[in-house]
């Protein structure tokens, strides 16, 4: 009965948005400028799917190169705490090529800071309350705008469709961009004297946070809020991405999509999390990050004996943002970071 009630509530909250667009399928090879330069993908007579398969396999095999980040000196922090810096990845949209972040300083942070990545389609105020909650326990927070979100969204968009869509190559590249942006944000915090740095992400932000933590040695702890081992499976089976699935259907199988999007999935990088302290959070009645996927990732951590803490929310995905569940979620995230940073 309780499951049925939460699922009905989740569906109702999902249906409040009527601006979702089913976009045309595209392999998106033009979004991967280094595709032709990789020997494994250089056979231009191969099909688009085969080329992306080879590209993804090479990216996972050398993920340090795929997610290699270069620091920049071009940071601009204004008096309101708005930080801007150039993205390492250049896309066709000028707005998206400038990274925006908002700094929330804790009065006595003792060198502790966390990069915060909100959920997919969050607006500019998403997770600001959480940042201020972190401030209350002495942790400075840097709230990062993901690619194609809020300040970075071109006029042609109403939603952040270009980071998760039926354009396969674009999704791969823009999620990679998000990780490189987060690594530059960590570099800025480190340059400001912060010695104990964590990362906290929700939903899509959680996936990107784990990818960042797995490849950024300056990150010590990761709080992952809504979890799955595979990017493709969430898009394929999740409530929030039904319209994306519609654009994919008939063009690519789940198995093929899982292979192509493996570089932006947590699964290949689990062993890299062994050096960190990690909090895994999932919701018991989640339809967007299906519970079987969340439990699968938890089991992977357990089987491999990777250090972690676990919290299970008694709600769904959308309802995590509703009272009283948002307070419980915030408490678990804050307590974890307070104890581990």
For each feature predicted by the language model, list its residue ranges.
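Cap/lid segment of the alpha/beta-hydrolase catalytic domain
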Residues: 116-176
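Conserved acidic catalytic loop of the alpha/beta-hydrolase fold
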Residues: 179-195
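The feature captures the conserved acid-bearing segment of alpha/beta-hydrolase catalytic domains
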Residues: 237-293
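C-terminal catalytic histidine-bearing segment of alpha/beta-hydrolase fold enzymes
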Residues: 295-341
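N-terminal targeting or regulatory segments adjacent to alpha/beta-hydrolase or S9 domains
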Residues: 1-84
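Proline/glycine-enriched tight loop/beta-turn segments at coil->beta junctions
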Residues: 94-99, 105-114, 136, 273
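Hydrolase active-site cap/lid region
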Residues: 210-256
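Gly/Ala-rich beta-loop-alpha elbow adjacent to hydrolase catalytic centers
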Residues: 201-205, 209
């Amino acid at each position: 009965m309780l499951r049925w009630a939460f699922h009905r509530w989740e569906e109702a909250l999902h249906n409040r948005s009527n601006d979702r667009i089913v976009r045309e399928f595209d392999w998106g090879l033009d979004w991967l400028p280094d595709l032709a330069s990789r020997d494994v993908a250089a056979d231009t007579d191969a099909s688009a799917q085969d080329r992306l398969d080879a590209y993804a396999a090479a990216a996972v095999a050398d993920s340090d190169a795929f997610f290699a980040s270069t620091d920049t000196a071009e940071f601009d922090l204004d008096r309101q705490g708005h930080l801007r810096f150039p993205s390492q990845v250049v896309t066709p949209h000028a707005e998206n090529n400038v990274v925006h972040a908002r700094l929330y300083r804790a009065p006595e942070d003792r060198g502790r800071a966390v990069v915060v990545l909100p959920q997919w389609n969050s607006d500019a105020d998403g997770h600001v309350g959480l940042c201020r909650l972190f401030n209350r326990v002495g942790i400075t927070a840097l709230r990062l705008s993901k690619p194609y979100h809020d300040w970075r969204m071109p006029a042609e968009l109403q939603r952040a469709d270009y980071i998760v869509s039926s354009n396969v190559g674009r999704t791969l590249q823009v999620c990679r961009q998000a990780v490189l942006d987060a690594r530059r944000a960590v570099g800025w915090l480190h340059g400001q004297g912060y010695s104990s740095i964590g990362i906290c992400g929700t939903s899509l932000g959680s996936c990107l946070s784990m990818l960042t933590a797995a490849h950024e040695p300056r990150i010590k702890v990761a709080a992952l809020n809504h979890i799955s081992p595979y990017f493709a499976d969430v898009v394929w089976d999740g409530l929030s991405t039904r319209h994306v699935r519609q654009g994919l259907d008939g063009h690519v199988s789940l198995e093929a999509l899982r292979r192509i999007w493996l570089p932006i999935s947590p699964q290949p990088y689990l062993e890299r999390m062994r050096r960190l302290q990690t909090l895994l959070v999932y919701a018991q009645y989640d339809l967007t990050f299906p519970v079987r996927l969340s439990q699968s990732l938890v089991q992977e951590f357990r089987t491999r004996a990777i250090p972690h803490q676990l919290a299970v929310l008694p709600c769904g995905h959308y309802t995590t943002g509703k009272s009283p569940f948002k307070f419980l979620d915030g408490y678990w995230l804050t307590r974890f970071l307070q104890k581990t940073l």
